[in-house]
Amino acid sequence: DLLESRGLGDVYKRQFFCWLEENAYALINGNVELRIEAIKRSCQIKARIVENDELEHGDRALLNLGHTFCHALEAVTNYSDILLHGEGVSIGCNLAFDVSARLGLCSQEVPSRVRNHYKSINIATDISQINGFVGNTERIYDLMAQDKKVVNGVIRFILASDIGKAMVQENVSKDLIIEVLQDSLER
């Protein structure tokens, strides 16, 4: 899936993200050869990560960039067709980069670049773009606190210091997450 490919580019390979940026127009307009190449590359990246970390103790967790946000958004929309999984991952990746910048893990240019790339190919970047969305930030946060990545009551976020450089971050304040969610609702 092309949206999952973009997520892999965000989290694991800056070179792949740059390739996706360069080929965005052709990919979105159906260039079959490039789509096959994008999916092939993303599968190779994912397979390499899973092979090296079968039990998700290291780099494999980084494949979940955006997924903590995504799973909560899917739940709050009752897993309906108003939010496809790939769209949720896209919005979640953008939220993760926003949190990363606010924590000072990356410069503000990084989430701006990711958001601009997604927008250039008409992929959702914010909660406000979910048609018919009815929810609030507290409910989204509560659902995030139930995610499988919660350990001993602490949400483990996959955040980024740059495109292609992700890390696990714990103890991110609820207030910061609520603020980022609210901004995404209002954008």
For each of these PLM feature ranges, what is it?
Residues 105-187:
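C-terminal charged capping/lid subdomain of soluble metabolic enzymes
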Residues 22-138:
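Active-site segments that bind and position negatively charged phosphate/pyrophosphate groups
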Residues 1-12:
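Single conserved hydrophobic/aromatic residue that forms the stacking wall/gate
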Residues 8, 59, 152-154:
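A structure-centric signal for secondary-structure junctions around beta-strands
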Residues 1, 101, 167:
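Short, flexible active-site loop motifs that bind/organize anionic cofactors or intermediates
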Residues 6, 19-23:
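Acidic/polar active-site rim loop that often engages polyanionic ligands
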Residues 13-17:
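Internal alpha/beta core interface subdomains
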